[in-house]
Design a protein with these regions (language model features):
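Catalytic core of membrane glycerolipid acyltransferases/transacylases, capturing the structured
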Residues: 1-60
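Non-catalytic C-terminal accessory region of glycerolipid acyltransferases
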Residues: 20-24, 47, 63-201
């Protein structure tokens, strides 16, 4: 299973809250800076089980991941968490309502390669030190066939995310806002010009 999320709400706490509720999974992120490696190791020690890492560095996956290596790292849990609004790797542009949304294709391609479920997941802060984790409807498996229907997958994920985001718009992180671009008010027949403008920002 691959859980995809956004830079929304207290996203940094999501891996720990999932583990606290018995949902063991590994989140993909950029490598920790050297000055924080000691703290990172300490955090890992507080988040059992020890044989399933809390985080997996993007450098460990690489641009051409070996599935056997990833399965070995994930261990028996087989769960991976990834952000889809990061400006890293191959990108996909999906029109949604009055916006053009940029998303990374890595989680989608990995789910297709692993034949894994792709599930939208968001965490929100409902009050001080109170959080709710929202699991959306998984992406239909036929969208993940070979080749995957990227636009259909992107639209499905955005529809699921929007049900939560519209209730808590103040919890949008700046990185999430940077992944959204306004569409012209009168619409556009060819999105390529809008995509080009977005890529040039």
């Amino acid at each position: 299973m691959i859980g995809v999320s956004l830079n929304f709400g207290p996203i940094a706490t999501l891996p720990y809250w999932l583990r606290a509720h018995g949902i063991v999974h590994t989140s993909v992120r950029t490598p920790a800076v050297d000055s924080l490696k000691g703290l990172t190791i300490y955090q890992f020690s507080l988040s059992p089980p020890a044989d399933v890492p809390v985080f997996l560095s993007t450098s460990e996956i690489g641009s051409s991941p070996r599935l056997s290596k990833i399965r070995k790292i994930l261990g028996p849990s087989g769960r991976l968490g990834m952000l889809i609004d990061v400006d890293r790797g191959k990108q996909l542009y999906v029109p949604f309502e009055d916006r053009l949304f940029r998303m990374a294709t890595g989680p989608i391609r990995l789910a297709q390669m692993l034949d894994a479920e792709l599930i939208p997941v968001l965490i929100v802060e409902t009050s001080t030190w109170k959080y709710t984790i929202h699991f959306g409807t998984p992406v239909p498996q036929h969208y993940l066939s070979n080749p995957p229907d990227m636009q259909a997958i992107g639209t499905h994920l955005l529809q699921e995310f929007s049900t939560v985001i519209t209730r808590y718009p103040e919890q949008c992180n700046m990185r999430l806002l940077r992944a959204m671009f306004p569409l012209p008010e009168n619409g556009v027949a060819d999105l390529s010009a809008v995509v080009h403008a977005a890529e040039s920002r």
